[in-house]
């Protein structure tokens, strides 16, 4: 048994927040400090023609948060693998991830190439290590992101209070929730899956078509990184005008269109 297979065997099964509809399967993975409510605009449309399975990530929503979990990308993906395995799916499925969920989706597709027929990565926070970036302007931007993330991790009270205010102001509800209960999952996932990541190589390794959907106002997209993956033959990038990091109507419409073509729409 490989080390990853053993990790999957020991991983907890995550909360399945939605399992609705019939047809080809689409699995949804939300982002950091969030829940399956991220996809509230896309689930009603997708379930008309597909079986929709929305999984809540390790440590978030109603999923388990083991005390000994370090929230590495391998632990996250192992738990996703254990959950999908428990469903006994017979055919390859479309895997849709938002924010952190998109990074986990890319790693899942790289590890399980026979299971994923298509990847849709919405608002992926893809970063290279600053020392790997030649362009000084891009390197400066990415370094600023890393400092900001470090500040959030090191200032618990500020981060929890600010997140609550932002959530209320923008009416995000459970789409953004940083609390005492998920603080450990938030900080470790941020540090070990977003600040330190191999997403570009995971995307390169995946052997299925990949659609990257990103808003032009996304505050977590570093300049230059999308250009790198956009040059890969199996990647198509969709830029959504006047949308930020959140799955709002404009972004939701493009996600639906990448999956169901012109038939998809949101009223």
What spans do the regions from the language model cover?
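Flexible "cap/lid" loop of the alpha/beta hydrolase fold
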Residues: 110, 118-148
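Conserved loop-alpha-helix segment in the C-terminal half of the alpha/beta-hydrolase fold
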Residues: 210-243, 249
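Conserved alpha/beta-hydrolase catalytic His-Asp/Glu region
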Residues: 121, 130-132, 149-205
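Conserved alpha/beta-hydrolase "nucleophile elbow" surrounding the catalytic nucleophile
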Residues: 30-32, 97-102, 215
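Active-site loop/oxyanion-hole signature of alpha/beta-hydrolase fold enzymes
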Residues: 54-96
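Conserved HGGG/HGGXW glycine-rich cap/lid loop of the alpha/beta-hydrolase fold
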Residues: 18-62
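Alpha/beta-hydrolase fold catalytic core
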Residues: 1-27, 47-51, 77, 82-92, ...
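Short glycine-enriched nucleophile-adjacent loop
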Residues: 102-113, 119
């Amino acid at each position: 048994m490989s080390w990853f297979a053993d990790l999957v065997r020991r991983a907890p099964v995550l909360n399945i927040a939605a399992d609705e509809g019939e047809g080809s399967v689409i699995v949804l993975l939300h982002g950091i400090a969030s829940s399956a409510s991220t996809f509230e605009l896309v689930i009603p449309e997708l379930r008309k023609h597909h079986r929709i399975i929305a999984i809540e990530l390790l440590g978030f929503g109603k999923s388990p948060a083991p005390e000994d979990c370090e929230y590495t990308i391998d632990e996250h993906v192992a738990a996703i693998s254990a959950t999908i395995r428990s469903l006994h799916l017979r055919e390859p499925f479309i895997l849709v991830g938002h924010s952190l969920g998109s990074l986990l989706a890319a790693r899942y597709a790289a590890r399980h190439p026979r299971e994923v027929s298509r990847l849709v990565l919405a608002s992926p926070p893809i970063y290279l290590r600053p020392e790997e970036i030649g362009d000084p302007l891009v390197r400066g931007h990415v370094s600023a992101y890393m400092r900001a993330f470090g500040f959030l991790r090191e200032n618990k009270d500020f981060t929890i209070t600010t997140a609550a205010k932002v959530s209320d102001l923008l009416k995000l509800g459970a789409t953004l929730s940083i609390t005492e209960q998920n603080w450990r999952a938030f900080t470790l996932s941020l540090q070990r899956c977003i600040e330190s990541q191999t997403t570009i190589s995971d995307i390169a390794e995946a052997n299925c078509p990949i659609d990257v959907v990103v808003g032009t106002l996304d505050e977590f997209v570093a300049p230059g990184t999308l250009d790198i993956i956009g040059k890969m033959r199996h990647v198509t990038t969709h830029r959504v005008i006047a949308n930020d990091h959140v799955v709002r109507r404009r972004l939701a419409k493009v996600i639906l269109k990448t999956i169901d073509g012109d038939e998809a729409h949101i009223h």
